[in-house]
């Protein structure tokens, strides 16, 4: 009888450890989107950048982790066409902005996650752009095989100071605001 109880206890422990095993869901980079908007005194520009790879980690259907790599060489303005699009794309990839020849990728690594309920989580992560890492906090929603989030990033924290009134005086209508926005839709 004692052996039967020991076996039953071992079985229960084994089952309980199975239920808390982490499940890593690889993001389908080809179906996921990252849209950006950068604003200036006289208007704004918008575009896309491609996700290179990424994964979300779940335990008991709750988000517990995530890592992402963005291909900065794909940075593209979509609000312009022709020559003007080419000029803006080139400038955004130059050292004044993202320096994509030297820094072809950016990364995001989740550090802490708190559930807000209804598949919404508050995430604090380390964001690395141009070799500089800073914490960022945002909400992410997960539903089925989809996750969405919006991030506001202060580019000056990553040594992207071009056109920033925080660093240069007398820019007038040439001022570019420090924050840019990302709208992210992940498919996995």
Locate the predicted segments by residue.
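Bacterial Sec-dependent N-terminal signal peptides
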Residues: 1-25
């Amino acid at each position: 009888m004692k052996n039967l109880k020991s076996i039953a206890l071992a079985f229960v422990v084994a089952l309980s450890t199975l239920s808390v095993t982490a499940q890593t869901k690889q993001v389908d980079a080809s179906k996921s989107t990252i849209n950006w908007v950068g604003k200036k005194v006289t208007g704004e520009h918008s575009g896309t950048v491609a996700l290179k790879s990424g994964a979300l980690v779940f335990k008991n259907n709750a988000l517990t982790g995530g890592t992402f790599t963005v291909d900065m060489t794909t940075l593209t303005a979509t609000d312009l066409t022709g020559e003007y699009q080419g000029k803006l794309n080139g400038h955004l990839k130059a050292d004044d902005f993202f320096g994509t020849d030297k820094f072809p990728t950016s990364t995001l690594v989740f550090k802490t996650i708190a559930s807000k309920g209804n598949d919404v989580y508050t995430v604090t992560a380390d964001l690395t752009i141009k070799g500089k890492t800073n914490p960022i906090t945002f909400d992410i929603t997960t539903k089925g095989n989809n996750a969405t989030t919006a991030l506001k990033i202060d580019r000056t924290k990553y040594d992207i100071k071009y056109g920033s009134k925080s660093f240069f005086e007398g820019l007038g209508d040439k001022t570019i605001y420090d924050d840019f926005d990302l709208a992210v839709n992940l498919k996995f």
